[in-house]
Amino acid sequence: MKPATPKAELLPSNQLPKAVFRGPLLLGKSFLGVLTICAVVMLSSWIATLAEAAPEEKPAANAQSAAEYKLTIPFGLEESKVVIPEDNPLSREKVELGRQLFFDKRLSKDNTIACASCHLAKFAFTDGKRVATGIRGQKGGRSAPVNFNRVFSSAQFWDGRAATLEDQSVGPFINPIEHGFANHDEMIAKMMKIAGYRKLFKEVFGEEDIKIGNVGKAIASFQRTILSGNSPADRFDQGGEAGAISEEAQHGLLLFREKARCTKCHSGFNFTDEKFHNAGIGWDTNTVDLGRYMLSKNPEDIGAFKTPTLREIARSAPYMHDGRFKTLEEVVNFYNQGGIKNPHMDPLVIPLELTDQEKHDLVQFLHTLNGEGWQQATAPKAFPK
């Protein structure tokens, strides 16, 4: 079978042991109550080094001090796992600037696509489509990934090609299918014509000249405030709320950890091992996306994609990196049969032999993973002029 080269990415009870989420297989150490991170920063002390997509930039000496920003971590998530770069600390002004940029369709070649176009709150910050759609209705080769809880994540995108959230934040602008700019300079030239943006960048970064690295910092800061936690499943296991989930879902949770082997990949409090796996997607139709291999050139990575979080999974259909499954039932059936055999199959993916009732209960558990912490990520009332 000849693998296909992917298109650009726009480019989804009483028998239970006590605290079944705890331990190395799933949520690990947890905290009671809501945790708060307070970051008070001086922007004038920055020396930021971004990767290829976001080159080195130094704020002007007269950059203002940033106002305190309080990142509230919902119950069930882990404060110690928060990743905020030293060269891009959170501030209220920067987060609000990032919000403007995230929702502004003018940051596309034809003024039709914003970051939020593919990351809609009602679809758990995906777009509800099999593959994402960019300018002029062009279709990408992959499903839009969720962008909440990115404050806990390392490599970004399905294939992990962006090492940081700052890099991820500016990559789509120069994707010909997504935002459509030929290069970052073209986009910056367009932004520089908007006096309101020059003013905001002056206030946040100390200079009117807009730099792509600072665009990435602002958008990444906003994305780090989009969270999902305090789900019924969290409250059942960690909060001791016995009635938070149904008995079917409780049985599904036990299956999740044991017979269904879900925690082999969907582990930890964010339900992801942050690694890359090949489950055989595409090998049945000769449409294999080479995935991680395109970056690593390691044959073991052929067809491997990053494990997505399962939080909000009931709202993020369709599923898999190519959006092939419309329902969670289809996903469970796929893994129950052991994926799709191929020469580079991850050995963790094996037939599960779940009964119909067990598959039903597992899906019921997955429906308990919707939470809160993202509801404040709304569009601004107005955009800079």
Model-inferred region functions:
Residues 26-27:
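Juxtamembrane cytosolic/matrix-side boundary and N-terminal portion
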